[in-house]
């Protein structure tokens, strides 16, 4: 039975295909989002990793930023690595513009450059075993607001957080065989869509 949801994956940079593959494994319809108007046709949005300052240049150039701000204020969004930076309320090292929707302070490239990237497992509040986490030039969450739930940690720093309909990971769950983080986001989108589905019956 179809869940009647469509999740968009922002396809301006980063490994957006890996996110689509994971969503496909979960039986969820996904589309690549490259134009602002394509946000109108989706129920949730994945913002993949990459370089956050480059992301901003693309968004400014394409007229995306205002439309994206409006989207994340109303519908579920999931940011990984650079995507988490874009969602954050405060960005450090250096400071930069962001969507400001997620009440965290995040430091860019906190764990070193790409050569220092790592794969590890860590404790998580998600059901099941410890979570495999792939870090690539990862940012570090240095502060979380009162409404932010920490779902996984690395060295006592949050690496997976949720605030309402917003989910963010400083690692790359799309590069792991563990699909639980994407499953969580899919369920968040389904929950958001329930009232709309019920009204149209």
Summary of predicted features, one role per range:
Residues 47, 79, 169:
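Redox-cofactor binding/interface segments in oxidoreductases and associated redox assembly factors
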Residues 12, 82, 171:
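Cofactor-binding loop segments of dinucleotide-utilizing enzymes, especially the Rossmann-like FAD-
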Residues 108-201:
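Amide-donor transfer/coupling interface in amidating biosynthetic enzymes
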Residues 1-3, 37-40, 70, 78, ...:
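Solvent-exposed alpha-helices and their adjacent loops that cap or buttress functional pockets
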Residues 30-31, 77, 166:
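Hydrophobic anchor at the start of a short beta-strand
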Residues 52-123:
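Cysteine-nucleophile active-site neighborhood
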Residues 4, 42, 73-75, 96-97, ...:
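Short coil/turn connectors at secondary-structure junctions
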Residues 1-61, 67-70, 179-183, 187-201:
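N-terminal beta1-alpha1 cap of cysteine-dependent amidohydrolase-like domains
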């Amino acid at each position: 039975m179809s869940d009647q949801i469509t999740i968009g994956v922002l396809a301006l940079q980063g490994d957006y295909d890996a996110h689509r593959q994971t969503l496909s494994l979960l039986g969820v319809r996904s589309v690549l989002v490259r134009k602002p108007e394509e946000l109108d046709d989706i129920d949730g949005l994945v913002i993949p990793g990459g370089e956050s300052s480059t992301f901003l240049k693309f968004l400014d150039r394409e007229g995306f930023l205002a439309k994206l701000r409006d989207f994340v204020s109303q519908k579920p969004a999931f940011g990984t690595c650079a995507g988490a930076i874009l969602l954050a309320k405060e960005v450090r090292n250096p400071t930069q513009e962001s969507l400001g929707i997620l009440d965290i302070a995040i430091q860019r490239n906190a764990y070193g450059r790409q050569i220092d990237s790592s794969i590890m497992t860590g404790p998580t509040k998600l059901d099941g075993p410890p979570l495999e986490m792939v870090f690539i030039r990862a940012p570090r969450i240095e502060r979380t607001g009162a409404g932010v739930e920490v779902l996984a940690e690395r060295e006592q720093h949050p690496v997976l957080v949720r605030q309402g309909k917003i989910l963010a990971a400083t690692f790359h769950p799309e590069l792991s065989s563990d699909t639980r983080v994407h499953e969580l986001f899919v369920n968040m989108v389904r929950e958001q869509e329930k009232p709309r589905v019920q009204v149209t019956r």
